Amino acid sequence: MARTKQTARKSTGGKAPRKQLATKAARKSIPTGMGGMKRPRRYRPGTVALREIRKYQKSTELLIRKLPFQRLVREIAQDYKTDLRFQSHAVLALQEGAEAYLVGIFEDTNLCAIHAKRVTIMPKDIQLARRIRGERA
């Protein structure tokens, strides 16, 4: 079938202009100075992330809550021996070590992602970091 050139036709109606919702109309009509709630500041994507990175790099406090970590330690220890008791300093030492390990693995994971020309870490980056470290064959 041969193609034919289409000519412009006059419109016979079409869609009517949509009415604004009451909330949108009210929001536009009320100036911000007349008692309207001021919206919180919206930062550009990545700004808050960089601020958090700087904040956590400066700090030395533990990032995992103490009680949930303690429950996890007790749950894992119960698989090996029941009725084990832990000194509070022992649980803190375990938590320090666990957090240091996690920070290190995430640093290596980030390097693996950057090497792959990405900024987002993925499970395959963690697997590669562990493989290079010799933790998993």
UniProtKB/Swiss-Prot annotation:
The modification Phosphoserine is found at S11, S29. It is found in: Nucleus; Chromosome. Disulfide bonds: none annotated. The keyword Phosphoprotein applies. The modification N6-acetyllysine is found at K10, K15, K19, K24. Keywords: Acetylation, Chromosome, DNA-binding, Methylation, Nucleosome core, Nucleus, Phosphoprotein. SMART domains: H3. One of its GO terms (cellular component) is nucleus. InterPro entries: Histone-fold, Histone_H2A/H2B/H3, Histone_H3/CENP-A. Pfam families: Histone (PF00125). Residues 1-43 are annotated as: Disordered. One of its GO terms (molecular function) is protein heterodimerization activity. SUPFAM superfamilies: Histone-fold. The modification Phosphothreonine is found at T12. Acetylation is generally linked to gene activation. Can be acetylated to form H3K9ac, H3K14ac, H3K18ac and H3K23ac. H3K9ac could compete with H3K9me and prevent gene silencing. H3K9ac is restricted to euchromatin. Methylated to form mainly H3K4me, H3K9me, H3K18me, H3K23me, H3K27me and H3K36me. H3K4me1/2/3, H3K9me3, H3K27me3 and H3K36me1/2/3 are typical marks for euchromatin, whereas heterochromatic chromocenters are enriched in H3K9me1/2 and H3K27me1/2. H2BK143ub1 is probably prerequisite for H3K4me. The modification N6-methylated lysine is found at K5, K10, K19, K24, K28, K38. Belongs to the histone H3 family. The nucleosome is a histone octamer containing two molecules each of H2A, H2B, H3 and H4 assembled in one H3-H4 heterotetramer and two H2A-H2B heterodimers. The octamer wraps approximately 147 bp of DNA. Variant histone H3 which replaces conventional H3 in a wide range of nucleosomes in active genes. Constitutes the predominant form of histone H3 in non-dividing cells and is incorporated into chromatin independently of DNA synthesis. Deposited at sites of nucleosomal displacement throughout transcribed genes, suggesting that it represents an epigenetic imprint of transcriptionally active chromatin. Nucleosomes wrap and compact DNA into chromatin, limiting DNA accessibility to the cellular machineries which require DNA as a template. PANTHER family: HISTONE H3. This is Histone H3.3b. It comes from Lilium longiflorum. The gene is soH3-1.
